[in-house]
Design a protein with these regions (language model features):
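A conserved short beta-strand
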Residues: 10-20
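Short alpha-helix in the alpha/beta-hydrolase fold that links the catalytic acid
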Residues: 29-30, 36, 50-60, 83
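Serine-dependent carboxylesterase/thioesterase catalytic core
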Residues: 1-9, 22-24
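Short beta-strand/loop motif that positions the catalytic acidic residue
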Residues: 34, 40-42
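Acidic catalytic loop of the alpha/beta-hydrolase fold
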Residues: 22-24, 45-49, 76-77
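Alpha/beta-hydrolase-fold catalytic nucleophile elbow
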Residues: 18-19, 41, 71-72
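Extracytoplasmic/secreted proteins, especially bacterial periplasmic and envelope-associated proteins
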Residues: 11, 53, 57, 109, ...
């Protein structure tokens, strides 16, 4: 059986990965052909994607060290922007952060960090 080449979308010049799932399914060389800068975020208190099987597995599989961020006191759903009152009423599990975690303040910091990462990673004239 012929060996297939990894699929690649050359338009993607950098990526931000947040709360990466399924990292444990990667083969040791599963991400060896990733050649773009990566920013990788993990919530330290994520009980749905516990450390080290998910984001850490992705981090270790990347050929180049990513800009790796671990958010203290954050849970699984804290990467979702603050919920509206209506959504909070029907989906409190995804809208309520850990005690003492300020989701709105975190998203201000998160947004700045993501924009700064793309500013560093994407060079003029690199468009698809």
């Amino acid at each position: 059986m012929p060996v297939s080449r990894p699929w690649q979308d050359r338009r993607i010049k950098a990526a931000v990965l947040v709360a990466s799932a399924m990292g444990f399914t990667l083969s040791p060389n599963g991400l060896k052909d990733v050649k773009v800068p990566i920013q990788l975020w993990r919530a330290k208190e994520d009980v749905f994607l516990p450390h080290p099987r998910y984001a850490e597995a992705v981090r270790k599989a990347l050929p180049e060290a990513p800009d790796y961020r671990v958010v203290a006191n954050a849970g699984r759903f804290d990467f979702i922007p603050p919920c509206s009152k209506a959504l909070s009423g029907i989906a409190p599990a995804i809208c309520t952060g850990a005690p003492g975690f300020d989701r709105a303040a975190f998203h201000q910091t998160f947004n700045v960090a993501v924009i700064a990462f793309f500013g560093r990673a994407l060079k003029p004239g690199q468009a698809g």
